[in-house]
Design a protein with these regions (language model features):
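Glycine-rich phosphate-binding loops of nucleotide-dependent enzymes
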Residues: 2-250
């Protein structure tokens, strides 16, 4: 078996008697499009916080590209190639789209503060940022302030900023959250354009988006993995319908 892009072994987290993650063995393959779903309170956010280092585990290990990152600081996990978007938009809303992505790339390169001073290297960073926007279909909005964009496009910019960090693994935390149903298609289109070598874990409540994009789905319930498999198997599993997809027998 090849090395996973991201893997947990026996990952656990408890707050006193409350267990939010119970011995989770999870594997994100390289280049995968993998979704994590589950009802409210299933432990999805806690699991992602453990992956990113926002929470310290009570037990178990986390490996990123075979390296043990269990006790690594959040900032160092980002530098190792683990990037996350958030449910709540965290962009610099008064800056233009290009500036937001440029700042992310500059942070990755360790020259964020130096952007205030002109230098040839800064031009290369700006060119990289614009090229990324072109790839993702956002070049037309490059010079627009983020707060002038529709909310759906703001979420696209958030993904572009995460990609500016050059991640090996991208954690998409509810990318469709707060987006009107008529705008969710732009999220799908952009995610379909993501580079194939980036491993993607999507945490999402929008089942249409999940089943369109993911080739593997993990269902989390009460801090444990209930089932994992391809979309057809998940959609047809009676346990999933009962706890999550709304087909509870009466």
């Amino acid at each position: 078996m090849t090395d996973a892009a991201l893997e947990t072994r026996g990952l656990s987290k408890s707050f006193g008697a409350l267990s939010v993650a119970s011995a989770i063995d999870f594997r994100l393959e390289k280049g995968a499009r993998h979704a994590l779903i589950g009802p409210n309170g299933a432990g999805k956010t806690s699991f992602v916080n453990l992956l990113t280092g926002a929470l310290r585990p009570s037990g178990g290990t986390i490996h990123l590209d075979s390296a043990d990152i269990t006790h690594l600081a959040q900032s160092l996990r980002v530098k190792r190639g683990l990037a996350r978007t958030f449910q709540i938009n965290t962009l610099f809303r008064r800056l233009c789209v290009l500036e937001n992505v440029t700042l992310a790339i500059a942070e990755r390169e360790g020259v964020a503060g130096a952007l205030l001073r002109p230098a040839g290297r800064h031009r290369a960073i700006i060119e990289e940022a614009f090229s990324l926007l072109e790839t993702l279909g956002l070049a037309d909005a490059a010079l627009q302030p983020v707060n002038a964009l529709a909310y759906g496009r703001q979420r696209l910019v958030e993904i572009a900023v995460a990609l500016g960090l050059a991640p090996k693994v991208l954690l998409l935390d509810e990318p469709a959250a707060g987006i009107p149903s008529g705008e969710s298609g732009v999220i799908v289109t952009m995610l379909e354009r993501l580079p194939a070598d980036i491993s993607v874990l999507i945490i999402e409540h929008d089942m249409d988006l999940v089943f369109r994009l993911a080739t593997t789905i993990t269902v989390l319930v009460q801090g444990r993995i209930l089932i994992e498999g391809p979309p057809d198997a998940i959609a047809g599993d009676p346990r999933v319908r009962e706890v999550y997809l709304g087909d509870r027998k009466r």
